[in-house]
């Protein structure tokens, strides 16, 4: 049986281990057909997470925030207040069973969301995530992507910088990329609320992934 995608928004920061446990439980339920697919919008307390490709040398300041190893793809990233995390739990068996297409769709979702704020988000070959051209040869990352797939059910997802403390990224080499920086919507001179961003994410999701 196919259910419509459920949307969940957490108003308070969610501890990382709690979020992982909740995703694990939901993935099993989606696979069993007892729960609908889920998009979970939340923020975390300040932390660093290490993906399966993380290089320990990229953890510059290991004592700054808690560090969690996780099974998602990618390297080190930062999560914290002011960053909208969207955990996306979808059943790819009924969505084409193509992980590469799924990641491209996450990128497209972010690009369309940023366009709602008149920001041109761009892909970069060989670099997962969404980037903003700052001019003069400078480009900064505004959104990260890290996914895991179990029995064709996705979890983890995306992290869009709305108004985080960008200095918190200094404790790592984000995604192992030393030559580029990070930015946020507020750093670009925009002032959307988290509710504004959530509305944009919810409006553009069906454009990319289809209506329920």
Curated annotation (Swiss-Prot):
Record function comment: Catalyzes the transfer of endogenously produced octanoic acid from octanoyl-acyl-carrier-protein onto the lipoyl domains of lipoate-dependent enzymes. Lipoyl-ACP can also act as a substrate although octanoyl-ACP is likely to be the physiological substrate.
Primary localisation category: cytoplasm
GO molecular function: lipoyl(octanoyl) transferase activity
Other known facts: In the reaction, the free carboxyl group of octanoic acid is attached via an amide linkage to the epsilon-amino group of a specific lysine residue of lipoyl domains of lipoate-dependent enzymes.
Entries under Pfam families matching the protein: LplA-B_cat (PF21948)
Residues annotated as domain BPL/LPL catalytic: 33-212
Organism of this sequence: Paramagnetospirillum magneticum (strain ATCC 700264 / AMB-1) (Magnetospirillum magneticum)
Gene name for this UniProt entry: lipB
Protein name as annotated: Octanoyltransferase
């Amino acid at each position: 049986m196919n259910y419509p995608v459920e949307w969940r928004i957490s108003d308070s920061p969610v501890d990382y281990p709690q979020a992982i446990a909740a995703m694990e439980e939901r993935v099993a339920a989606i696979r069993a057909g007892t729960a609908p697919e889920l998009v979970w919008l939340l923020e975390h307390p300040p932390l660093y997470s290490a993906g399966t490709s993380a290089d320990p040398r990229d953890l510059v300041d290991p004592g700054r925030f808690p560090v969690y190893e996780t099974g998602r793809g990618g390297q080190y990233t930062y999560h914290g207040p002011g960053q909208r995390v969207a955990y996306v739990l979808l059943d790819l068996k009924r969505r084409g069973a193509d992980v590469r297409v799924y990641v491209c769709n996450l990128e497209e979702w972010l690009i369309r969301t940023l366009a709602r704020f008149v920001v041109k988000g761009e892909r970069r070959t060989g670099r997962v995530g969404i980037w903003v051209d700052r001019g003069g040869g400078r480009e900064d990352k505004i959104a990260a992507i890290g996914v895991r797939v179990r029995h064709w059910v996705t979890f983890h997802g995306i992290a869009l910088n709305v108004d985080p403390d960008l200095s918190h990224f200094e404790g790592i080499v984000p995604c192992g990329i030393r030559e580029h920086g990070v930015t946020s919507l507020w750093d670009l001179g925009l002032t959307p609320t988290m509710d504004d961003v959530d509305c944009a994410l919810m409006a553009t999701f069906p454009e990319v992934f289809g209506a329920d």
